Regions:
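A short, well-ordered alpha-helix in the C-terminal region of glycosyltransferases
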Residues: 293, 300-314
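C-terminal alpha-helical cap of glycosyltransferases
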Residues: 317-337
Length: 337
């Protein structure tokens, strides 16, 4: 595998998506021969079909999805194909990839065993995990679960990270007592935020109104950096699937020199040790106590913020990609031997 090899990317094309972070990182480390098959529309259609579960509609969908994918495969000379999630791909597509002898990688940013949301997983991915040369997963717990079920597949622990282009330090004065939370709505997050005694600025989609807090629209990267820079506290509230692990914001907040107050978890404590490079909580009561502690101890929290920023430097997507490519080299050697 060399830097002239053609690399295919399959996934969604949105500004804040993992796909674009990794494409930027590939370019940063001089892998410029990239072909991107974006699948926004068909992924959206597939998620709707999952709700109805009609086999005839799925057959029709598979016809169009396979046609699009075949054209992409035969038109290009791919050496590696990185699929982000790929829940909409059926078994026939994997046969085409195998025939072309393409090294196949999956970077899975969700829980493949979670069928609660139609956008999170599908029977397709569960059936076809064994077709991947490397299946990358962000959680150590999920990696163990996958390894116990699929004995012949290589599973690779690939945590989230931050984008050097998108997540940067913006020089803004901290607004005293500004608490921000940037993220999407879910019931657990809502209940937790409702219990916070101080006013929180919430940025994201689908949030109902609060008596005490201010709800703002979803923000993109430039605005994200500004909000983090202005906040005395940047909250990170882990969703159910991320408990005891981490999420994308785990690395993004420190990389933008934010002070992260986050749900207590084992993995986050490894990346950004509690009370040294982050502050953590388990309950609403503890969360309120930590907020007061931060407001009353600016010198201590300034050191925590600075330490976390320095520690974040080894967690860029450039670094993640170099680590993954090293393992892809090994697979390529085995294939050739």
């Amino acid at each position: 595998m060399n830097k002239k090899d053609q690399i295919g990317i399959f996934g969604l094309n949105y500004e804040n998506n993992l796909e674009n972070f990794y494409i930027n990182s590939l370019k940063n480390i001089k892998y410029d021969n990239i072909k991107f098959l974006e699948n926004n529309f068909l992924f959206y259609v597939f998620c709707i079909l999952q709700k109805f579960n009609n086999k005839y509609l799925f057959r029709l969908f598979n016809f169009f999805q396979n046609l699009k994918f075949k054209k992409f495969i035969y038109k290009n000379d791919l050496k590696i194909l990185i699929i982000f999630k790929g829940i909409e791909l059926d078994s026939n597509i994997y046969k085409i990839i195998k025939n072309k002898k393409i090294i196949l990688v999956n970077i899975y940013p969700d829980d493949p065993f979670n069928f609660e949301s139609p956008a999170t997983s599908s029977k397709n991915i569960i059936k076809n995990i064994e077709n991947y040369d490397i299946f990358c997963i962000w959680s150590k717990k999920l990696k163990k679960k996958l390894e116990s079920r699929y004995k012949n597949t290589i599973f690779f622990y690939l945590p989230f990270g931050y984008s050097e282009e998108k997540h940067f330090v913006k020089k803004n004065n901290i607004i005293k007592k500004k608490i921000s939370f940037i993220g999407s709505y879910d019931k657990k997050r809502y209940d937790l935020l409702k219990g916070i005694n101080q006013t929180v600025d919430i940025y994201g989609n689908d949030w109902p109104s609060f008596e005490r807090h201010k709800v703002h629209k979803y923000v993109k990267n430039k605005e994200l950096a500004k909000i983090i820079a202005q906040s005395e506290i940047s909250l990170n509230l882990l969703k159910k699937q991320n408990l005891n692990s981490h999420n994308m914001r785990t690395f993004e907040i420190p990389s933008m020199r934010g002070l992260m107050l986050t749900t207590r978890s084992y993995e986050q404590n490894i990346f950004f040790p509690e009370n040294r490079a982050s502050l953590m909580f388990t309950s609403t009561k503890e969360l309120n106590k930590k907020i007061e502690y931060i407001f009353n101890n600016p010198i201590i929290t300034k050191k925590i913020r600075a330490r976390a920023y320095l520690m974040s430097k080894k967690h860029s997507y450039n670094m993640r990609l170099k680590y993954l490519i090293k393992h892809l080299y090994e697979i390529n050697k085995i294939r050739k031997s």
